[in-house]
Structure formats: structure tokens, C-alpha cells
């Protein structure tokens, strides 16, 4: 009964939540790119498959809520995530994707840790790659400022 209740009360708002999820992810991707970060997000014109994405995707939902940023090293990636979680309350380090708050992980040391170095490189996963599933809680401008402070703490 509890699961049925959860589905019945949350499903009607799923479309709105996904639109906000994607809108915020694009804003975060743009802010990181402005800071000089190497960002992977199909909603950015710099993405190699940007045109294909625009051709195939549902325009109402943007490019989704998941992005990746390469900080250049595992040390920087960890500093970035630790700062965002512990100093900014920006989100949580976790290997999951679906949550109302932001979730982040360094794929090379989490979801893909069983791969050797060569396999990671073939898959495009560098030691400094951080995957962010952007949440839709809090004020967007506050979240962008937190993200920028996290970037500066990791790279400055």
C-alpha cells in the first residue's frame, strides 16, 4: 500500500520535476564551462553530439539532468565532491542517479572501479571525471554559487 501511495502522489508531477532537473543541469553545465571546466553535457553546443541530440530529443525535457566534468585528477575530483558535500551542502556522494538532491560520483573509483586503466581510458573515464545528477531542490542561483565555490576549492 505504501508504494502504491508513493507512485500515485508523485507520478503526476514527474514531468515537471524532470523539466526542472534538466533546466538546472544545463545551468550547472554552462556555469562550469564558463569557469573553464571540461564539461560533458549534450545540451551544450560544445558537445560533439549536440546536433544529433537536438534532432532526436524531446525539446520539453532538455538534455536531461546528468552531466560530467573532468577535473584532471582523482585528487581534484575528490576535493570537488568533498567540498560540495561537506562545506556547501550541495549534494551527496553516491553512485545512484535518481533523487531530488544532487548526487555525485567519481566513476573511475566507483561505478567503473573494476576496469583497468586502459579500459577506463577506452571508455572515456579519466581519474578526474565526476558525474553529477543535478537535483531540483534549493534556489538555482544559490546552487550555482555553491558549484562555483566547489570548483574553485578543487582547482584554485
Where in the sequence are the language-model features?
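Structural motif of enzymes handling amino- and sulfur-group chemistry
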Residues: 1-78
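FAD-binding core of FAD-dependent oxidoreductases
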Residues: 3, 93-108
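Short amphipathic alpha-helical segments with coiled-coil-like heptad repeat character
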Residues: 27-33, 88-89, 140-145
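Short Gly/Pro-enriched turn/cap motifs at secondary-structure boundaries
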Residues: 57-59, 89, 93, 121
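A generic structural signal for well-ordered coil/turn residues at beta-strand boundaries
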Residues: 63-65, 98-100, 126-128
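PLP-dependent enzyme catalytic core of the Aspartate aminotransferase-like
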Residues: 74-75, 102-156
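A common structural junction motif
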Residues: 84-98, 149-156
Amino acid at each position: 500500500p505504501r508504494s502504491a501511495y508513493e507512485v500515485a502522489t508523485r507520478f503526476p508531477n514527474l514531468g515537471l520535476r524532470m523539466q526542472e532537473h534538466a533546466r538546472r543541469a544545463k545551468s550547472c553545465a554552462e556555469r562550469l564551462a564558463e569557469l573553464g571546466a571540461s564539461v560533458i553535457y549534450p545540451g551544450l553546443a560544445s558537445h560533439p553530439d549536440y546536433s544529433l541530440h537536438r534532432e532526436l530529443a524531446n525539446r520539453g525535457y532538455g538534455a536531461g539532468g546528468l552531466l560530467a566534468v573532468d577535473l584532471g585528477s582523482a585528487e581534484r575530483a575528490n576535493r570537488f565532491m568533498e567540498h560540495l558535500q561537506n562545506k556547501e551542502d550541495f549534494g551527496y556522494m553516491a553512485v545512484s542517479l535518481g533523487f531530488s538532491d544532487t548526487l555525485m560520483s567519481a566513476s573511475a573509483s566507483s561505478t567503473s572501479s573494476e576496469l583497468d586503466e586502459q579500459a577506463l581510458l577506452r571508455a572515456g573515464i579519466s581519474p578526474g571525471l565526476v558525474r553529477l545528477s543535478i537535483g531540483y531542490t534549493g534556489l538555482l542561483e544559490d546552487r550555482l554559487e555553491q558549484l562555483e565555490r566547489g570548483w574553485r576549492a578543487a582547482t584554485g
